[in-house]
Amino acid sequence: MNIKKLVRKDIRELIPYQSARKIGGKGDIWLNANEFPEFNNIKLNNIILNRYPECQPEQLTSCYSSYIGINKSNILITRGIDEAIELLIKTFCNPQNEKIIFCPPTYDMYNISAKIIGIKSYEVPLLNFSWQLDINNIAKYISDAKLIYICNPNNPTGNLINYQDIITLLNITLGKTLVIVDEAYIEFSPIHSLTNLIDTYPNLVILRTLSKAFALAGLRCGFILTNVNIVKFLLKVINPYPIPIPTTSIAVQFLSKNNINEMRNRIFDLTLNRFWLVNKLKSMNNCVEHVFNSFANYILVRFYNSRKVFDILSKKGIIVRDQSNKLHLSRCLRISIGTSKECLEVVRVIQKINSLCVY
């Protein structure tokens, strides 16, 4: 039996998302998935697993509402941001004639999720090197696009999207298109969050996660923050039991006041590591062409020979993410910010490459 003949043509041709775990590699220093470099101590006591969980656990919704400062009715819990991306497309896009807009170089799952569901995409690249929205070009495609995905801070470039451009986009799409702002990394630059605009713009949807700053990537817990009417429709489409009971228990622990303070302290330390790493790399002119400014827990670096740098780092057990195949990112590697010790080892290896001109 030829199973391939039964598979949708577009799925047969689909190039799937290459997660850090799929790509793999052998090493001791993992700086390729923007995970927090150190793990948390987690307690699981008296967990009852013979009953199905609530669709939207009340305790977790309340805790996140207190943390984020918005009403509980504006929150939908999902299994990470990836489920949220897909859920919005399923709910709002008609495969026959509606599309999404995404702005590369950015997170690949916006486009891949649309393809899997059978929705076409408009690709409107960010302006080269500034990595800002091309508002004039986006405006040309709004009429038959239901969703626009924006990552802020943007992954993999690390920059913030201009606030006024987002406001302009919200205004020109009002009543026509939802503007979805992925704030997966916003805890590393919290004053730039758009949560205060949810009541002002009914077409604004914000995506959040516990994977990055909260160091809970393995938990798969995300949030959609938006107006009440959008939440009501999403609840029609989301799976009946999306949030496992252990996920709720752990997430609630880490949304306590003490753990939130600890998270902010960790971000402070990691930000110091980022500044230090950026300054060191900028001094290595023989092999480093450019270090892009970052407001997240990773940096994007353009090397004169990124393949050689990538291979040498890998041989030394340091796993980073090659971005050279992305639009406008030739010779670029993305390096997640690790511990002080890990950053020191990255610098040691690249300094050797720089001094010997081995690239």
UniProtKB/Swiss-Prot annotation:
Signal peptide region: none
Alphabetical list of PROSITE patterns matching this protein: AA_TRANSFER_CLASS_2
Enzyme Commission number: 2.6.1.9
Database matches in Pfam families: Aminotran_1_2
Catalytic activity annotation: L-histidinol phosphate + 2-oxoglutarate = 3-(imidazol-4-yl)-2-oxopropyl phosphate + L-glutamate
Gene3D superfamilies: Aspartate Aminotransferase, domain 1, Type I PLP-dependent aspartate aminotransferase-like (Major domain)
PTM-bearing positions, type N6-(pyridoxal phosphate)lysine: 212
GO molecular function: histidinol-phosphate transaminase activity; pyridoxal phosphate binding
Keyword Transferase found: yes
Keyword set, alphabetical order: Amino-acid biosynthesis, Aminotransferase, Histidine biosynthesis, Pyridoxal phosphate, Transferase
Pathway(s) where this gene product acts: Amino-acid biosynthesis; L-histidine biosynthesis; L-histidine from 5-phospho-alpha-D-ribose 1-diphosphate: step 7/9
Gene Ontology biological process terms in this record: L-histidine biosynthetic process
Group of enzyme by EC: transferase
Cofactor field: pyridoxal 5'-phosphate
UniProt-listed PANTHER family: HISTIDINOL-PHOSPHATE AMINOTRANSFERASE, HISTIDINOL-PHOSPHATE AMINOTRANSFERASE-RELATED
Family: Belongs to the class-II pyridoxal-phosphate-dependent aminotransferase family. Histidinol-phosphate aminotransferase subfamily.
Record text on subunit structure and interactions: Homodimer.
Protein name: Histidinol-phosphate aminotransferase
Species: Buchnera aphidicola subsp. Melaphis rhois
High-level lineage: Bacteria, Pseudomonadati, Pseudomonadota, Gammaproteobacteria, Enterobacterales
Gene: hisC
